[in-house]
């Protein structure tokens, strides 16, 4: 295994909250997959949930070396938890194609939040 990419991102939770106050659920609908949307709607702290998902997806796009552009979209990355609660990442559409082209076989995700911030790091390996 070799590291193909590393990305990290930090999000100010109040900034996400301000966007939601201004534009309603548009940001959440743009960032989240359908499965994540279902969790978001039921979550006790939806703004914090969205901020963490946003951070993971930004970090993943950075690990790919592209950022969110050229057909790559937030909702092409899906964050889920394994049976032990560990965060994991799934790819769809352009993100899945790019992962295949890069030879991604393993993905490591870590995320954290503390009062004002959410942060995430993603490592993609061959």
Curated annotation (Swiss-Prot):
Biological-process GO terms, alphabetical: fatty acid biosynthetic process
Necessary cofactors: Mg(2+)
Domain of life, source organism: Bacteria
Gene Ontology MF: a single term: holo-[acyl-carrier-protein] synthase activity
Catalytic reactions of this protein: apo-[ACP] + CoA = holo-[ACP] + adenosine 3',5'-bisphosphate + H(+)
Main location, first listed in the record: cytoplasm
Cross-referenced HAMAP family: AcpS
Descriptive protein name: Holo-[acyl-carrier-protein] synthase
Protein's organism: Pectobacterium carotovorum subsp. carotovorum (strain PC1)
């Amino acid at each position: 295994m070799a590291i193909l990419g590393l990305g990290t991102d930090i999000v100010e939770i109040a900034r996400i909250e301000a966007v939601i106050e201004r534009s309603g659920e548009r940001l959440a609908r743009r960032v989240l997959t359908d499965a994540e949307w279902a969790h978001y709607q039921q979550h006790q702290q939806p703004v914090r949930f969205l901020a963490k998902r946003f951070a993971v997806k930004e970090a993943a796009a950075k690990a790919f070396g592209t950022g969110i552009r050229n057909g790559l979209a937030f909702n092409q990355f899906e964050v889920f938890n394994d049976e032990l609660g560990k965060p994991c990442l799934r790819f769809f559409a352009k993100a899945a194609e790019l992962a295949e082209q890069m030879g991604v076989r393993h993905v490591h995700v870590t995320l954290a939040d503390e009062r004002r911030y959410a942060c995430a790091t993603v490592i993609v390996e061959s």
